[in-house]
Amino acid sequence: RDRSVSRGLGDVYKRQAKYTANVTAIKTLKQIESEHRHATAEEQDILAHYSGWGGIADAFDSSKENWRREYAELKDLLTDKEYSAARESTLTAFYTEPYIIKSIYTALENMGFTGGEILDPAMGTGNFFGNLPAKMAENSRLYGVELDSLTARIAKELYPEAKIQNRGFERTKFENGTFDVIIGNVPFGDFKPYDPEYDEYLIHDYFFAKSIDKLKPGGIMALITSAGTMDKYDDSFRRELSGKADFLGGVRLPEDAFRTAGTQTVTDILFFQKLEFEHENDRNLDWVRSERVYGEASVFQAVSYTHLRAHETLSDL
């Protein structure tokens, strides 16, 4: 059966404990695979504690005296391909705390969503699936995408009934208008994925642009992204997005929201609803505009906080 995640990632937030939980999960996965069977409930509990390598780059650095044992252990445990992928993920693989995920689902319930076709386009091991409310899960079909092989294999053991693809979102071939909800924590950075249909977007904007197209009319996109999506002075992407979706609201998370995952990146949770028809008129587009703000944190800041409300509870949306 699918695994329900009840323990927070905070249980293993210390770097050494996180490393140990990850290695134990990988050893368990490899044993399961070598025996050509599915995970038991007890093994699923072990696998569910895998939380990626974000924040523990020292384990991949041979010059770190205090991490030499771990460095050698990983070189022995992982294949060359797995090792390279894990090392590269130390700056990008930050998993989402269950309390944040549950708040997003509460907001979706308040918006009237009771179940349907749900996609997580950057699923990790599937925390968004594991925290799906039971009643919503009964009426839903789950689809996930995960680039990293080890992570995707763990996700498949945790959620065998979900349809999970081990590839980048840019290599998926979902039909437009497929999903009722697209939810997740998208990667962010200063690089562009290769996708001829969406070749002008940085990675975080790319996930928004493609996700909107994959939603059914009236479908909802609830994504965690870097503050840059709403803060950047160039509003061309927000303007493009406004032609396809209504901005339902957003919450700026505290800087320490992902501290236990190893990062303090400023992030927003943004909710959009796909329009029935593109470029509908008579809608409030104030959220698209950005204004120059001179302050300690940033030169540019998008919109007013009547649209992006700092630290408010998602249940208010």
Which residues fall in each region the model found?
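Single conserved hydrophobic/aromatic residue that forms the stacking wall/gate
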Residues: D2-Y13, H307, E312-L317
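S-adenosyl-L-methionine
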Residues: K156-T172
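Conserved Class I SAM-dependent methyltransferase catalytic core
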Residues: E200-D256, I269
